[in-house]
């Protein structure tokens, strides 16, 4: 055989070996469709399990936050009202120190202290969206509760004559209706 023929033969054999190796690689790379589907299903199942666990954890966290919000909803109000309590305690201790000689002075200071404490309490209520219900004019059953009716030449029927107990709202909700007497 000539050298060229020998080279051609060798080159052809090399090409056949390369093609055979590539064919074997393709066969190795080709995956059974059932196995591929099973692997994909397993991957989706794993993702589902993780997502479900994340969802359940978030749900538990939200429930805990909700319970804490309900349990401590009035914490801010309670802190504010403690200052009013302190004022009352100071007033009571001032009374304990009173005697006949300083009774007038203590009474005057008590009156001033009660006024200041009243204003302090009103500010706490206002800060917490608690407002007094306006109880002048015509009776409104949504915010007033009629305790009695009285004869009155000065007022029209269903006009409020007297407020027995003030009413209050918290935001837009009636906390306690105003107790009133109305004209017949």
Curated annotation (Swiss-Prot):
Residues that span the membrane, as ranges: none
Extract the GO molecular function terms from the UniProt entry.
Answer: adenyl-nucleotide exchange factor activity; protein homodimerization activity; protein-folding chaperone binding; unfolded protein binding
Q: What is its main location?
A: cytoplasm
Question: Region annotation Disordered: residue ranges?
Answer: 1-38
* An example Gene Ontology CC term for this record: cytosol
Q: Which family does the similarity line name?
A: Belongs to the GrpE family.
List all Basic and acidic residues biased stretches.
1-10
Q: Name one GO biological process term.
A: protein folding
The UniProt function text for this chain reads: Participates actively in the response to hyperosmotic and heat shock by preventing the aggregation of stress-denatured proteins, in association with DnaK and GrpE. It is the nucleotide exchange factor for DnaK and may function as a thermosensor. Unfolded proteins bind initially to DnaJ; upon interaction with the DnaJ-bound protein, DnaK hydrolyzes its bound ATP, resulting in the formation of a stable complex. GrpE releases ADP from DnaK; ATP binding to DnaK triggers the release of the substrate protein, thus completing the reaction cycle.
Keywords of the record, alphabetical order, are: Chaperone, Cytoplasm, Stress response
Q: Name one Pfam family in it.
A: GrpE
Q: Tell me the subunit arrangement.
A: Homodimer.
Q: Which InterPro entries match?
A: GrpE (IPR000740), GrpE_coiled_coil (IPR013805), GrpE_head (IPR009012)
Protein name, per record: Protein GrpE
Which HAMAP family does the entry mention?
Answer: GrpE
